C-alpha cells in the first residue's frame, strides 16, 4: 500500500458524522417524549432548554442531564450556537418563536397545531423561507408504524387504485388531566386531534378539493366540540371519511389507536384494533401486525405515539443532513391547517367548503416576538 493509499484509508475511517445541536423550547406535558426521542437518534443532541416556568425548566434539565437552561428564548438563541430549535409550546406562542428562530438563522420544528390562524401560519412559512432556514411541523401521527405500513401497502398497489377510505379515532380517554387547557379551548377536537387525522387522510389519499363537516359537544364540562365527522373529496378521486370522538365509551378503550379502512379497485385494506393489518385482494387475504417497536422509555398506552415522535424527529435530522424538504414542512402543513379551518367553517355554516376558497393569501396578523414561553 502506498503512503497516499494509507492516508486515504485513515481519512475514511476517521471521518465523523456531523452532530446537529438543538434546543427545546417548552418543557410541558408532551416535551418529555421529544427529549426521550432525541436521545434515541444518532446525530442529534439537545444542548439547551427554555421555558418560562423555572421549576418545570429545572426538572426537565435534571431529568435529561441538560445544564444550559433559559427562561427567555431570544436570550438562548443569542447565546447558543444551534443547528435547530424544537418548539414544543402551545399554539399562541408559535409565530413569535418561529420568527425569532428565523431571525437568528436557526432551523425550526414547531409543534401542532402550527398556528391559530392561516395568516399566522403563512407568515411563519414566509419568515423561514426569507431566512433560508428549514421549517417542519411536528405532525407525528402519520409517522406511527401502523400508518406508515398502510401507506406503503397503498403505494405498492396492494388493493389497486383506492376509491374510498375512512380514518377513525374514537375514544373516551381522559386527555384533560394531563393537558387541562384543552377543556377550556372553544375549538377542541378538530384543532387538537382532528388535525392529526386529517393529515393522515392527506398522507394516504392526497390533497383535498372540498369537504363537509358536522361537529357536536357531548361533554358539557368542556368548552369545545368533542365529536367531529368530516366527508372529504380528494384530488385523487378518493372519497374519505374522517371521524373523531372523545365521547365514545366503548367496551374496550383503544386510545390512542387510529383505525383505517380503504377500498380499492382490486381489494380492501383494514387496520383494526391492536394494529392488525388485513389486506384482501385477488391473491387472498393476508394479515400482519404493525405494532410499534418496544422503546425503553415508552409508557402504556402511548407506545405508538412515542414511536412516531422518534420517527418524525429522525426524519428531520435526515433532512437537515441531506438538504431534503421534510414531509410535513411548514408549507405542506398549510394544507392540513386549511382542512381544520374548512371543517369549522363547514360545521358552523352547514355547507360544503371548497378548499380553493381558503387558498387566497390572507393579511398577516401582527405579532410581537416575546421570548417567554409556556406549554
From Swiss-Prot:
Residues that bind NAD(+): 29-30, 51, 93, 111-112, 140, 179-181
The GO terms this record gives for MF are: metal ion binding; nucleotide binding; oxidoreductase activity
Catalysed conversion reaction: D-apiofuranose + NAD(+) = D-apionolactone + NADH + H(+)
What Enzyme Commission number(s) does the record list for this chain? 1.1.1.420
Q: Quote the pathway field.
A: Carbohydrate metabolism
Q: Which PANTHER family match?
A: CONSERVED EXPRESSED OXIDOREDUCTASE (EUROFUNG) (PTHR43708), OXIDOREDUCTASE (PTHR43708:SF8)
Protein's UniProt name = D-apiose dehydrogenase
Query: Which positions bind Mg(2+)?
Result: 38-39, 41, 44
Protein family according to the UniProt entry: Belongs to the Gfo/Idh/MocA family.
What does the entry list as the binding residues for substrate? Answer: 112, 179, 192, 196, 246
What positions belong to coiled-coil segments? none
- Any Pfam family matching the protein: GFO_IDH_MocA
Q: Which domain of life is it from?
A: Bacteria
Q: Which Gene3D superfamilies match?
A: Dihydrodipicolinate Reductase, domain 2, NAD(P)-binding Rossmann-like Domain
UniProt keyword terms in alphabetical order = Carbohydrate metabolism, Magnesium, Metal-binding, NAD, Nucleotide-binding, Oxidoreductase
